[in-house]
Amino acid sequence: PSKNAQEFFSRDEKIVDDAFIQNANEYLNSQKTDPAYTRITSSFMRAFDGKPKLEIPINGKRIFELREYQSHNELKALLKVQMFNEGEIAIFNATGLKSVFFGQTLIGPDIPNLTYMLVYENQEIRGKNWQAFLKHPNWDRMKNMEIYKDTVSKIVARFLDPAPYSQV
């Protein structure tokens, strides 16, 4: 996560920071025969007006869910961003879905898309909160609004465990 474009473009300089090196020792010293990853994919996103800053609402043991909503054209993608800004984020908050960030992908794979991250203490809480979201009367109203029909053509969800050196 970066506060601005300059911070984003200077991100590699942080790798030589002593604290980062200490916390990421296992990762940075992984062997070619047992790499920490296959390849890295990066995206440049614009934060949503409804959640302009990254937050970490839960510390300690937790799981992250990274969700990507792909759209079949740019207009539908913008309408889905609007849907979040005009009510869906508020429904998340009301039903216990704790968000880390929401971003519209400007540069990256599979555009047009938006990506957001949620955090939970465990899978059981995740299930309860999503059920509350699906039953919320404002969600039922919003999802049936004509303007928001067919805004998402594909959803990709990934579950992540935070590493000791993770910024989130």
Model-identified regions with their sequence ranges:
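Short S/T/G/P-rich N-terminal loop/turn motif that feeds into the first structured element of a domain
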Residues: 1-139, 148-168
